[in-house]
Amino acid sequence: MLDFNASASLSERIESLIDPALQAENQAQTPRTYLGASRLGAACERQLQFEYAKAPVDTGKEFSGRILRIFERGHRTEDMVIRWLRLAGFILKTEDANGHQFGFSTAKGRLKGHVDGVLIGGPEGFSYPALWENKCLNSKSWRDLQKNKLAVSKPIYAAQLALYQTYLTLHQQPALFTAVNADTMEIYAELVPFDAALAQRMSDRGALVIRATEAGELLPRSFTDPTHFECKFCSWAERCWSTKK
């Protein structure tokens, strides 16, 4: 038997086998050909342009195996919450009659969004039909959400909900937003009224990003310093700051 501990820990060895397989699986997926509505609340319009144009990310900024595992954790957690809500008596639909995930497409298919689910009935004290969206967060992020509420703590998610509510005509009832603490499995829940002004701003933003990208126009950066934390974590920071604009 090989002694993997001679050069690396068993944990490192297992990760070195799993991570490349996850990365290969991810790279084999068909890339998006549209701008995702869930991203329109991002801090920088230029970053959205790079995403929409499918610009190659900077060297070393590809999704690591660890990040891909976190993504999968989020998907699996969503499935669990769906089951829990149904057990609790909510009538939650996640697919249409054809078995496709609920969503919308606009701007000739260049802007799309896919929702976690729609609540069409259930316990008293809630209004139906209502949009349902779920996230899985680490403890620090979850506690900030609990303290400051969605609009302040997670504006990108607030923008996502507003867009989904308007394009799926689910704006008459507050959306149910849930977030699971990945460390403690506590559930945060918030009823989010429709924000028409936010939905309009985000819709306009999507149109701007699509129009400018297809015209070859580079939109301004949202930040003036490459050391800003948003830039440090951007997958296209090197590409962005190598231009004079």
For the regions a protein language model found, what residue spans apply to each?
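Alpha-helix initiation/capping motif
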Residues: 36, 64, 136-138, 154, ...
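Metal-dependent nuclease catalytic regions and adjoining charged, substrate-binding loops involved
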Residues: 4-6, 144, 151-158, 163-245
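Metal-dependent nuclease catalytic cores that hydrolyze phosphodiester bonds in DNA/RNA
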Residues: 1-131, 138-140
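A generic secondary-structure micro-motif detector
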Residues: 71, 150-151
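Short acidic, glycine/tyrosine-flanked loop/strand segments centered on an H-E-D-like triad
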Residues: 135-148
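Conserved active-site beta-strand-loop modules that form the wall/rim of enzyme catalytic pockets
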Residues: 127-134, 172-177
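Structured loops at beta-to-helix junctions and adjacent beta-edge loops in soluble globular domains
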Residues: 51-53, 135, 180, 237
